[in-house]
Structures are given as structure tokens and as C-alpha cells.
Design a protein with these regions (language model features):
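N-terminal chloroplast transit peptides
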Residues: 1-41
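Positively charged, low-complexity intrinsically disordered leader regions
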Residues: 47-98
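Anion-binding alpha/beta catalytic cores of soluble intermediary-metabolism enzymes, centered on
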Residues: 69, 74, 161-231
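Short beta-strand elements in bilobed, periplasmic/extracellular small-molecule ligand-binding domains
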Residues: 104, 126-140, 256-257
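Glycine-rich phosphate/diphosphate-binding loop of Rossmann-like nucleotide-binding domains
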Residues: 109-124, 203-296, 300, 305, ...
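Short, well-structured alpha-helical segments in soluble
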Residues: 146-158
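Rossmann-fold NAD(P)-binding glycine/threonine-rich loop
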Residues: 178, 196, 301-358
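Intrinsic disorder/low-complexity segments
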Residues: 408-409
Length: 420
């Protein structure tokens, strides 16, 4: 049963033919009734995910396991660049359609050089995609009350959609109190206890996912690396990376083990993993002997080691010994250039997500995705959804309502629904 998608601003159309999509058709053949007219049936969530997976075109390339050659390098710089370009396009559209520009506020306490560098890089990244950035710098001896005051002001500021408190804070401040003060709707770092709690619960979704773990999973998705049913090991159990990374892998239906400083036989446990995410901050700790042939390795560690040949006197390496592990694994992230660029890219993505949620702004792609989910679940609900869009709740605003977004035709060429 072919279904034709056409964007009425274009003369092109896409034909989705379920009969020729063999894997999907085999899964769903008993759900569909062959007919010249357009018909729908209730499908389960598993099938929806199957459709989504097979119709997606966002991945970069499939990673093939090849034990005879060195591992494929997962290019975090390239993926982060793609994401930043995608974010910039959506921000431009948001500005044009509803006049809103996402805003990110950063609070920096003290004069740590590394923290100042991180904040400077975040501001530069915001500027590159069109996000307004706001910055507050406080002295090392500032009080916790001063920090909370600025957080409260940003919580109430409608031009600010994301708030980030640069860690670590000075020792005289209660870090948890400060993080808890950030409005959960603007917690783009994803560290609020309610966001972490929702991440841990089945059937609940956090408003935001912590940026570094989110970047790790995004790399796996963009390279078409399967997670479902795989054995995954997370090395490290920090609140910032290890714990949320394990929760995300579990949400993707992986069987997850966490290796930490009290784990006995960490090498033996790690060697069973199809996917390894390491975030412990120990240079070259994971050797080639720890890696199962064909495993995929995501290295979060950034560790300086002495290097007399380097102008700086040191070089950066990860937790995983790249030279050894790359001979065994099927894919591996480099350090630098792997997970690092993804962290800031995910921060930009979370800030955009916050602005879209606050202002109820959605892209055509998101409208189509949600519509098809409704179609597969229930035809009548889909009709109600389409009429809601047309009549009174167009997500792209009044100007967009004047032009159809897309149309669906049956086999006889008759237009079934016109969305506009």
C-alpha cells in the first residue's frame, strides 16, 4: 500500500511503499489490509519504532565489524558540526516564524582557568548558532546567596531558556542547593534531581538529559550502532557521566553493568561488553586486553600525560589506550575529537529544546512524526489531530497556517487530508 508524501512548497513527492520495504512489510503484513483506498490499523509501539528506524535518514554510516583492520574512528567533531548546523537552521526558522531567539545564561564563580575556558567556548558556540548568551561572573569569595539570587533572576527572565552553573563551585558553597535552585524547565544541564529521577524511571521522560551522556548515545545513533539487546559496560559511576550514561543505555534496552573502584575483576567484566563507555579520568586504563573483538568504545576521559615532543609539554589521552584498543574494537572515539565536541553540541540542542517547549514551537518534521504515530495507533485520533492543526492550534503560527504543510493521497490520486 503506497502512501505519497508531498510538501506543497515543492514539486517533489516521496513514495513510501510498504510492499517493497521487505523487513517492515514482513513485520506488519498482518496489520495492513490491501486496498486501493487508504486504510490504517492500530499497531504496537514496537512496530512504530521499527518504522521510525527504517525510515530514518539521519545516520552517517553503518559501522561494520571487521577484525582484520583497525577500528573505525567515530568522528565527534563531524557529528557535533552537523548538530550545530541543524540547531542553527531551527533557530533561524524559530526567529522568522514566531520572533523568538533561544537564550542561555551561564554563572561562573571564581577564577579557575579551565572553567573560564569552558565558559568562553560555550559562549562562542552559542554565537555560532544564533543563541543569545548571558554571563554572570562572581568572585571566589561570593556567597551562596548571591549565586541563588542570580539563578532566581534568570528563572524569571522570559528571554532565558537555559541556565547553567559552571562546576565545580567553591568549597564553601553547597553544590546541590545551587543546582536544585535552577528551574527544572530551564535545567539544560540535566542535573536537577527531578530530571535525573525521571531518567531513572520507566515510562517517564526527563525534560533534559545531561549533555555528555546524551552526546555518547547520539554518537552511537548517528553511526547506526545497535544498542538494543547488547551488553554494555559503563566504567565510572559519577552523577555527571557514568550514572546517567548507564540509565540511557538501559532505556535503549541494553544489558548494563557498571564498573567502579570497588569492582572485582573489572577486566573480565569489561571484556564481555559489546559497548564500553569509559568515564573515570585515568589515562590509558582500559587496555586492548580488556576489549572484546568487535566492541564499540566511547571514551569520555580527557587526561594530560607528559610529552616532551609537544610544545605544551603534554598531550591529551583518554581512559582507553587507543593504540591497543583500536586493533581489537570495531569502532572507537578518539581523544581529543570524540565525545568532547558533543558535550557543547548537546548543550545547544537542549537550549533550543527548552525554547521550543516553552513557546510551543514545532518543526514540520516533528508534526509529521507525531501525526504518523497517531495514524498507526488510531485513524480517528489522527483526523482529530489534523483538524486541530488546521483550525486553531497550528504549531508554526498564523503565517504558516496560510500554506499547506503536506498532503496525503490514496492510490487513486485523491487527496485524503490537507494539512495547513
Amino acid at each position: 500500500m503506497p502512501i505519497i508524501f508531498t510538501n506543497s512548497s515543492s514539486s517533489t513527492a516521496r513514495l513510501l511503499n510498504f510492499n517493497t520495504t521487505h523487513k517492515i512489510y514482513n513485520t506488519a503484513s498482518h496489520h495492513f489490509h490491501r486496498s486501493n483506498s487508504l486504510q490504517f490499523a492500530t499497531l504496537n509501539t514496537k512496530f512504530i519504532r521499527t518504522i521510525s528506524t527504517h525510515c530514518s535518514s539521519s545516520s552517517i554510516s553503518a559501522v561494520q565489524v571487521n577484525h582484520e583492520t583497525s577500528a573505525k574512528v567515530i568522528d565527534g567533531k563531524r557529528v557535533a558540526k552537523d548538530i550545530r548546523e541543524e540547531v542553527a537552521v531551527e533557530i533561524s526558522r524559530m526567529k522568522d516564524e514566531i520572533g523568538i531567539i533561544p537564550g542561555l545564561a551561564v554563572i561562573l564563580v571564581g577564577d579557575r582557568k579551565d572553567s573560564a575556558t569552558y565558559v568562553r567556548n560555550k559562549k562562542k558556540a552559542c554565537d555560532s548558532v544564533g543563541i543569545n548568551s548571558y554571563e554572570v561572573r562572581l568572585a571566589e569569595d561570593s556567597t551562596e546567596e548571591e549565586v541563588l539570587k542570580h539563578i532566581s533572576e534568570f528563572n524569571d527572565d522570559p528571554s532565558v531558556h537555559g541556565i547553567l552553573v559552571q562546576l565545580p563551585l567553591p568549597s564553601h558553597m553547597n553544590e546541590q542547593n545551587v543546582l536544585n535552585a535552577v528551574c527544572i524547565e530551564k535545567d539544560v544541564d540535566g542535573f536537577h534531581p527531578l530530571n535525573i529521577g525521571r531518567l531513572a524511571m520507566r515510562g517517564r521522560d526527563p525534560l533534559f538529559v545531561p549533555c555528555t551522556p546524551k552526546g555518547c548515545i547520539e554518537l552511537l545513533h548517528r553511526y547506526d550502532i545497535p544498542i538494543k539487546g547488547k551488553r554494555a559496560v559503563v566504567i565510572g559511576r559519577s552523577n555527571i557521566v557514568g550514572m546517567p550514561a548507564a540509565l540511557l543505555l538501559q532505556r535503549e534496552d541494553a544489558t548494563v553493568s557498571i564498573v567502579h573502584s570497588r569492582t572485582k575483576n573489572p577486566e573480565e567484566i569489561t571484556r564481555q561488553a559489546d559497548i564500553i563507555i569509559s568515564a573515570v579520568g585515568q589515562a590509558n586504563m582500559v587496555r586492548g586486553s580488556w576489549v572484546k573483538p568487535g566492541a564499540v568504545l566511547i571514551d569520555v576521559g580527557i587526561n594530560p600525560v607528559e610529552d616532551a615532543e609537544s610544545p605544551r609539554g603534554y598531550r591529551l589521552v583518554g581512559d582507553i589506550c587507543f593504540e591497543e584498543a583500536s586493533k581489537v574494537a570495531s569502532a572507537i572515539t578518539p581523544v581529543p575529537g570524540g565525545v568532547g565536541p558533543m558535550t557543547i553540541a548537546m548543550l545547544l540542542s537542549n537550549t533550543l529544546l527548552s525554547a521550543k517547549r516553552i513557546h510551543n514551537f514545532r518543526t514540520v518534521k516533528e508534526i509529521k512524526r507525531d501525526f504518523w504515530s497517531l495514524v498507526f495507533y488510531n485513524q480517528e485520533t489522527a483526523k482529530e489531530y489534523s483538524l486541530k492543526i488546521i483550525n486553531d492550534e497550528h504549531p508554526l503560527g498564523d503565517r504558516a497556517r496560510a500554506r499547506p504543510l503536506f498532503r496525503i493521497f490514496d492510490m487513486g490520486g485523491r487527496m485524503v487530508w490537507d494539512f495547513g
